[in-house]
UniProtKB/Swiss-Prot annotation:
Probable multiprotein complex; a catalytic heterodimer of an alpha and beta chain is proposed to associate with additional subunits involved in membrane attachment and electron transfer. This is Putative respiratory nitrate reductase heme subunit ORF7. Gene3D superfamilies: 2.60.40.1190. The lineage of its organism: Archaea, Methanobacteriati, Methanobacteriota, Stenosarchaea group, Halobacteria. Keywords: Cell membrane, Electron transport, Heme, Iron, Membrane, Metal-binding, Nitrate assimilation, Plasmid, Transport. It comes from Haloferax mediterranei (strain ATCC 33500 / DSM 1411 / JCM 8866 / NBRC 14739 / NCIMB 2177 / R-4) (Halobacterium mediterranei).
């Protein structure tokens, strides 16, 4: 074999190696990729007690790290909030939806014993009409939202809102909350029946993706009312198929194309040198 042929054979072998590495890396990513801003809903068994924050049922449920930012507000120091990331998991049985929230908080603020003291709190927001996305700041009169609002003093409220300052409490909350605080971290599970025929109460039984947003208050940092950490819209994939771009696949595809591009440039350089 000539020296020129040896160089070409080496270049081809390099490309083959690159493609094998690419397929090994991209294959699993393409299989596990999910649409952007999706909170996967995993099926679990009711007997595994998913309502408990420390249940082993949650070990097999994918978690999403949701970035949090200060909510726009005219309150003093409204931009000075402390919760930057919320870990979210979601599961369902045949009858109920479970949403598990977990975040770092150095103090468990459960009681108010004096002025200027506030309890920790968290909220889950979903639209009443699951086919249309409402304004993220508490919905609107035409497209209201349900808010599941938990306070560390033990209270869970189910609210209806049609815009900022319009919240009204359901006469009886259908939302149940279980909580755990350990090693500087809150973990709570909020759950509700999937189906609901009640007026102005979200039903998860339809074949529609359901938008969802989150909020967290750190009581020891004077966070209350509009001073809170909030997310952008995410969604539960209850619909018939993927919605939105599979961002993980896109990232891996870009990386793969870059590898192939480098390999092609290498081949051209080898061929050029071989012809000199």
């Amino acid at each position: 074999m000539s020296k020129k042929s040896e160089k070409r054979a080496t270049a081809v072998a390099a490309v083959v190696v690159c493609l094998v590495v690419l397929l090994t890396a991209v294959g699993p990513a393409m299989v596990t990729a999910r649409p952007a801003n999706e909170i996967p809903v995993e099926s679990v068994l009711a007997e595994d007690q998913p309502q408990q924050p420390t249940s082993e049922a949650w070990n097999s449920v994918p978690a999403v790290e949701v970035p949090m930012a200060s909510a726009p507000s005219g309150l003093p120091n409204a931009s000075d909030t402390s919760i930057e990331t919320l870990r979210v998991q979601s599961a369902r049985t045949e009858e109920r939806l479970y949403v598990r929230l977990s975040w770092a908080d150095g103090t468990a603020d459960r009681n108010i014993s004096g002025p200027q003291q506030f309890v920790d709190a968290a909220a889950v927001q979903v639209p009443v009409n699951t086919t249309a996305r409402p304004p993220i700041s508490m919905g609107s009169t035409r497209n209201p939202v349900n808010v599941w609002y938990w306070r560390a003093d033990g209270e869970t409220e189910e609210l209806l809102a049609g815009g900022p300052g319009t919240t009204t409490k359901f006469e009886q909350s259908a939302v149940e909350t279980k909580t755990a605080y350990d090693d500087g971290r809150w973990t709570i599970v909020m759950s509700r029946e999937l189906n609901s025929d009640a007026e102005n109460r979200t039903s998860f039984a339809a074949n529609d993706d359901v938008d969802v947003a989150f909020a967290v208050w750190n009581g020891s940092q004077m966070e209350r009312s509009g001073r809170k950490s909030v997310s952008e819209w995410y969604h539960f994939p209850f619909g018939p198929g993927p919605q939105g771009p599979p961002y993980e696949s896109i990232l891996w595809t870009v990386a793969g194309l870059a590898i192939v591009g480098v390999a092609l440039v290498t081949i051209q350089a080898v061929q050029k040198n071989g012809g000199d």
